[in-house]
Amino acid sequence: MKQESMKVLFFIRKSRLKKNGEAPIFLRVTINGQLDEVRIQRSVPLKLWDNVKERSKGKDRSSTELNSYIEALKVRLYQIHKELLCREALITPKNLLIKVSIR
C-alpha cells in the first residue's frame, strides 16, 4: 500500500468579499503536490476568521456551527482518503472532493 501525503487547508479570500462584507471560505486539498480548491458555500465576517486555526473566532451559535461543519468536513476527507488508500485506488484532490460531494 503506497502512502499518500495529504494536507487540508481552510482559508478565506479577502478579494472576493460578499455584499454583506463576509468572506467566502475555501477548502484546498493537496495530495503529493497536486492541489485542488473549492468554495465550501459558507462565509464568515473578516474580523472573526483565524488564519492560523482555520476557524471562526466567534463564540456565537453561527460561529460554533461553522466550526463544527469545518471539523466534520475535515474528518470526512481523512476518512475517505484512508478508505481509498486501503483499496489502493487512484487518489487525486479532485477525486477526493467529488467523493465528499463538494465538487
Indicate residue ranges for each PLM-predicted region.
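Single-stranded nucleic-acid-binding OB-fold domains
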Residues: 13-23
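Long, polar/Ser/Thr-enriched low-complexity segments
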Residues: 26-29, 53
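Nucleic acid-processing catalytic cores of prokaryotic defense/repair systems
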Residues: 1-11, 28-34, 40-42
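Intrinsically disordered, low-complexity boundary segments flanking structured domains
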Residues: 25-26, 99
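N-terminal helical hairpins
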Residues: 18-20, 33-103
